[in-house]
Amino acid sequence: GRSANRGECAQACRMPYEIVCDGEEVDLGKTQYLLSPQDLAAHDLIPELIRVGVASLKIEGRLKSPEYVANITGHYRRAIDEAWAGRAAEFSPRDVEEMQLSFSRGFSHGFLDGNNHKVLVRGDYAKKRGVYLGAVESVGRSGVRLAPSTLVKPGAGLVFDGDDQTGLPEQGGRVYEVLNAKNGAVELRFGRGAVDVSLLRPGQGVWKTDDPELTARLRRSLEDPSARMVDLDLRARAAVGEPLRVEAR
């Protein structure tokens, strides 16, 4: 078969599926991405994992950006250091948002809390979503109104949920202008051609997918000449019919 660990992933988790039971197709509604799990996020379980003997953590990095690696490893490194010092790392809502913005199809503990398939697999989308802002309250000629769950500034990337059943397309673009409205709501406007507002509807879910300020900060951290460098000696042994063996010293 095609191994994702060898760069040959068939992307089965990104595809919609149908269920046929006793010859009849089951109405799944929006829940069509049956193999698309939420991302395993165990940052708040680090002390427990170390306590039970976990000695190494693997963080998904395949097809991810350098900014993602800098962001996620930074948060996990802090959690590990705090755990070794006998303290539990505190993750603020902003910390979690930063991790979600780097890449997230929703966070879950996977099977670390036992079996809960409905939490592990939502099934209603298969792409990166980021931070859920809320639902569209109203649609105007040049933008939408909603009460966002977190701060939105000009330049932020957004995506609006689509609906395959009704033909409502998924759309995304960058915010051009943010206008304050009443009762904590804001009006978001977009650049010309970025989002077709006529195709947006009240009740549509809105997600924040990118924060330019966060991305710029992460890129600066990658260019920091004072960043700690560690010498690493790798020795690899490959033989036909045997597993690849790599030692790091």
Model regions: which residues?
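Surface-exposed amphipathic alpha-helical tracts and adjacent flexible/coil segments at the periphery
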Residues: 1-249
